[in-house]
A protein has these predicted regions:
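Conserved NTP/Mg2+-binding pocket subregion across the NTase superfamily
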Residues: 1-47, 145-156
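Amphipathic alpha-helix face/heptad-repeat signature
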Residues: 25-29, 55-56, 112-119
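Charged/polar positions within long, soluble alpha-helices
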Residues: 38, 42-45, 64-75, 79, ...
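Terminal (often C-terminal) interaction modules
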Residues: 40, 91-156
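Hydrophobic residues in alpha-helical segments
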Residues: 44, 70, 85, 103-106
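Small-residue-rich helix-loop
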Residues: 55-62, 83-84
């Protein structure tokens, strides 16, 4: 029973993904991903595998926030993320397999930073293409060299 129309009003408010939220996530997240990836790389180089695991988790949280925002979808929470991404239109190539491999990789695996960087690069390329955001080269480190950072976005 929705006598006062409050349920109807709530459904209308959440029926479309807020453009301002999407814009904020897509503007701020690339820099966060760059920072976390740089920290992950430095932690790996010094053998701090606990920090590598922490940065991988930070990258995952930011990455999925960005992926759902790009697709105009509310983030479903931490459970069954890959199941939820299967319904998204804009995804990096072979995303599910590659993400699973990354998550199952040991934190001391030599390829962990390059696999992570590859997925981040492809997500940022999708943002650039789908959101028509201009990017400029990053100045983070050699693992992130030439990688995009948000410059001046335009909504699409």
């Amino acid at each position: 029973v929705d006598d006062d129309g409050s349920l109807r009003d709530l459904k209308e408010r959440v029926s479309t993904y807020p453009a301002a939220t999407r814009r904020r996530i897509l503007i701020e997240s690339p820099e966060l991903l760059e920072t976390f990836l740089s920290q992950m790389t430095m932690a790996y180089q010094r053998g701090d595998y606990e920090m590598v695991a922490h940065r991988r988790a930070s990258i995952q949280a930011t990455y999925f926030n960005m992926l759902f925002a790009l697709n105009h979808r509310y983030h479903p929470g931490e459970k069954r993320l890959l199941e939820h991404t299967s319904r998204l239109e804009a995804l990096p190539r072979d995303f599910t397999r590659r993400w699973r491999e990354l998550q199952l990789a040991s934190v001391d695996a030599p390829e962990i930073t390059t696999r992570t960087a590859g997925l981040v690069d492809e997500l940022l390329a999708l943002v650039s293409t789908r959101w028509k955001t201009r990017f400029s080269p990053s100045r983070v480190d050699e693992h992130c060299e030439g990688r995009p950072q948000a410059d001046t976005p335009s909504e699409s």
